Curated annotation (Swiss-Prot):
Keyword field: Membrane, Nitrate assimilation, Transmembrane, Transmembrane helix, Transport
Name recorded for this polypeptide: Protein NRT1/ PTR FAMILY 2.4
Family, per entry: Belongs to the major facilitator superfamily. Proton-dependent oligopeptide transporter (POT/PTR) (TC 2.A.17) family.
Purpose: Transporter involved in a passive nitrate efflux.
Species, as recorded: Arabidopsis thaliana (Mouse-ear cress)
Source taxon at top rank: Eukaryota
Amino acid sequence: MANSDSGDKEAHRSSKHGGWITLPFMLVTLLGMSITYFGWVMNLIVFLIEEFNIKSIAAVQISNIVNGVVNMLPVVAAILADSFFGNIPVISASAFISLTGISLLTLIASLDYLRPRPCETGSILCQSPSKLQLGILYAALALVITGTAGTRFILASAGANQYKKPKEQGRFFNWYFFTLYGGAITGTTAIVYAQDNASWKLGFGLCVAANLISFIIFVAGKRLYEHDQPLGSPYTSLVRVLVAATMKRKAVISYKDEDYHHRELEKETKTYVAMPSKSFRFLNRAALKTEGDSNNNMWRLCSVQEVEDFKAVLRLVPLWTSVMFLSAPLAVQMSMTVLQAMVMDRKLGPHFKVSAGSMQVIALVSGCVFIILNNWTTYPMYQKLIRKPLTPLQKVGIGHVLTILSMAISAVVEAKRLKTVENSHLMSVLWLVPALVINGIGEAFHFPANIAIFYGEFPESLRNTATSLTSVVMGISFYLSTALIDVIQRTTKWLPNDINHGRVDNVYLVLVIIGVSNFGYFLVCSWFYKYRNLKNDDHEQDLKDVTN
């Protein structure tokens, strides 16, 4: 009877909180925050060059570092959400911090004394920004970076938590990615156009408006959300497994179920297992009952579920590193595309000139379109012909191939551009389009699939971390791209400040080599990887719904 009452209360609570009524609040928040983020970050290189008189390659490096930090910090936000505050308060606080940062950027664009004097036309010697000016700029960037990091990927977890069924979570992820790309496209076109053709003050001011609306809408829907309850740090259990296994490293591993420790509540979880798996067998000692063990000493005796959760994280590490080297070439291409566009003919007709920072919108539009096409046509047609769905890893593999192809096309186009420059002509910026389109198609395959893999395969207690892990991978990839550009600049003459006298085509060829090597590594990793949550047809269908 007590259990029945408890179930009724749970059902009543679920009917009042969460569900599809929360979708508009989540999506409007995501849309506004995406417009804000892409509105300032996509044109950051141009802003640093034109408004702070920073050299082109130095501006690229600063942009890569900024992108790295903004993609690394979500894991910190995820830890705060999982361990202490829950994801709803973290998103609210982060949206406000972002609003403070973008407001400060707007002030910098509005007040002349917060920027160095602009270079005179044709002048080589330009006034460098003062320490105070750089300090205020970096403070603004730090605030808006922190705010962005605590919203984008935590919103994915918070939104998915509003639904109980994997199929509904899958539909939410579709809306999430569509809205994310929609905000990115709006920020990269409308906001960047306003910055280049009206003023930086107007462009950043529009970002302030978008951020403010996001913050108000999200807070307004707070009473409707299903709030997750932080249960203390889930990372402690991972450390405890390692400590317990080390303490009992001399114990003989048993093959009997009764020799291993279980907790009653774990039997209700979807991933419950009676016996520890054979992989990473040395960790099984953490759950092995030995003389002197006490159920109260969790640093010496862990449960089988905790051991298997730790193994699940370890199994994903090779895939995690392969995604990292998949994203690094994309980060370099993103930066180089802006520099290339700045020295190309950007006129489309007699009155319209494309913004250099807006060129990346082509990849975003391509990705958005092909996410829809994949879900509506490509994946259903494949399943109809082959009689089984594309797995998430197969989708990531297709993304690898398309990324390599994109880099190869970029190399060919840049080689042609340099020959055109030798003849004192400007090549049309439209030559950059094919590589960017293929880049976007590749992202439509690998980006949602990676999110689905990490969300579906991570332990339930680390779900916020799971969705932010893709962002961390992207962050590390930006640092790798920064290191790669630095090495190339130090060891070759391919990347001078004036790329018309460089060999960016050779940089792209290096990226092709990295991509091919990483694809081989990915094939090996995916061959040995076994899905944790694809043990039967139902689970396979669930993850297919999340990915598609």
